[in-house]
């Protein structure tokens, strides 16, 4: 077993620094042709609230430079459609915590796109004694994690769509179906191709590793150290046929020790330290069911600036995202 680094032979490297190399230019040319020929889709994972941003609203409604995260991603999709006359289906995965507000937002904001919504399941939150935490007339719940996409997406029509680019809502620099990525995915006939950036020390991202096959270890579960280790930015392309195959496969559950609000006799309690466990499934645990999957390094400064924290943190906050947008997003989205 070994973590994937910049020196790994099985890492796809279409960039030298921030510029495309010969392989990258080849992939881009292939991808541009395929964007004109194929019906592709994008899934935006939007089940989370902006709790760490001091808001109970869906994270996708948070604004960077006067535009919501949703708006930044919709603009990217519209640019692709305009530039390549691309046929792109748009899907948004919500949760019971975000569904109503997200749908209401898109009803009041016309992006000129046909968007389908589907909702992931919840899981019970349990206390340290293993019993479900009380929540008024029921039990406390939380979204079941991005791994529930394989079950939840069966709610929508995927007919004719060959591949789906799955991204997290919080990365304001996410390149959706960019030609380099699409070209690399089709060139080597992957079931899944994932993007990576070189991981920074103590950065809270999962790490890619090779253990008979490619895997990701979530940041809370890995001990990745060393130079050039590749971090997960939650930007994957899947064959639609693979996603359909995963429908009846149960992914492993991961427990996270969290501060979970609960009630006692109808009175709301907001704990100041972790008091229970949330159960999640992770999308990357599907990797073990692939025939072929791969990872492609991309430049962090152009493709990864997640909004994860409020201003009480010095990283991944509204200011760092604003700076990233000003430097790299406003200039051009598609290259």
UniProtKB/Swiss-Prot annotation:
Q: Where is this motif: Substrate binding?
A: 45-48, 218-219
Where does the protein end up?
Cytoplasm
Residues binding UTP, per UniProt: 45-48, 59, 120, 145, 170, 278
A Pfam family that the UniProt record links to this protein: UDPGP
UniProt GO BP: UDP-N-acetylglucosamine biosynthetic process
Recorded metabolic or biological pathway in which this protein acts: Nucleotide-sugar biosynthesis; UDP-N-acetyl-alpha-D-glucosamine biosynthesis; UDP-N-acetyl-alpha-D-glucosamine from N-acetyl-alpha-D-glucosamine 1-phosphate: step 1/1
The residues listed in the UniProt record as binding substrate, with positions renumbered to this chain, are 146, 308
Q: SUPFAM superfamilies, alphabetically?
A: Nucleotide-diphospho-sugar transferases
Main localization is cytoplasm
**Class of the enzyme per the UniProt entry, highest EC level:** transferase
> What are the recorded GO MF terms, alphabetically?
UDP-N-acetylglucosamine diphosphorylase activity
Its UniProt entry gives the catalysed reaction(s) as: N-acetyl-alpha-D-glucosamine 1-phosphate + UTP + H(+) = UDP-N-acetyl-alpha-D-glucosamine + diphosphate
Question: What keywords are assigned to this protein?
Answer: Cytoplasm, Nucleotidyltransferase, Transferase
One cellular-component annotation, GO: cytoplasm
Out of the domains of life, which is the source?
Answer: Eukaryota
Q: What is its EC number?
A: 2.7.7.23
What does the sequence similarity comment in the record state about its family? Belongs to the UDPGP type 1 family.
PANTHER family in the record: LD24639P, UDP- GLUCOSE PYROPHOSPHORYLASE
User: What protein name is recorded for this chain?
Assistant: Probable UDP-N-acetylglucosamine pyrophosphorylase
Q: Which organism is it from?
A: Encephalitozoon cuniculi (strain GB-M1) (Microsporidian parasite)
């Amino acid at each position: 077993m070994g973590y994937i680094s910049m020196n790994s032979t099985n890492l796809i490297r279409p960039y030298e620094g921030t510029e495309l190399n010969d392989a990258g230019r080849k992939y881009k040319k292939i991808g541009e042709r395929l964007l004109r020929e194929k019906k592709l889709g994008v899934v935006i994972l939007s089940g989370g609230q902006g709790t760490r941003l001091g808001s109970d609203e869906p994270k996708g409604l948070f604004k960077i430079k006067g535009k919501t995260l949703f708006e930044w991603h919709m603009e990217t999709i519209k640019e692709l459609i305009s530039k390549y006359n691309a046929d792109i289906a748009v899907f948004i995965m919500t949760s019971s915590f975000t569904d109503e507000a997200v749908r209401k937002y898109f009803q009041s904001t016309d992006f000129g796109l046909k968007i389908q919504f589907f909702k992931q399941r919840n899981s019970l939150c349990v206390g340290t004694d293993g019993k479900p935490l009380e929540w008024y007339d029921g039990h406390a719940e939380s979204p079941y994690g991005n791994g529930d996409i394989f079950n939840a997406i069966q709610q929508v029509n995927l007919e004719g769509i060959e591949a789906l680019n799955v991204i997290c809502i919080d990365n304001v620099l996410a390149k959706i179906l960019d030609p380099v990525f699409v070209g690399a995915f089709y060139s080597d006939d992957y079931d899944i191709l994932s993007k990576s950036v070189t991981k920074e020390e103590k950065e809270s991202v999962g790490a890619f590793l090779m253990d008979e096959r490619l895997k990701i270890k979530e940041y809370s579960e890995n001990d990745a150290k060393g130079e050039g280790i590749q971090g997960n930015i939650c930007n994957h392309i899947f064959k639609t046929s693979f996603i359909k195959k995963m429908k009846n496969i149960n992914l492993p559950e991961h427990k996270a020790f969290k501060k979970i609000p609960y009630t006692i006799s109808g009175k709301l309690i907001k704990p100041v330290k972790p008091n229970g466990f949330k159960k999640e499934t992770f999308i990357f645990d599907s990797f073990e069911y692939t025939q072929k999957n791969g990872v492609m390094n991309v430049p962090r400064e152009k493709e990864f600036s997640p909004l994860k924290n409020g201003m009480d943190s010095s990283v991944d906050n509204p200011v760092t995202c604003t700076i990233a947008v000003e430097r790299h997003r406003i200039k051009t989205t598609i290259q």
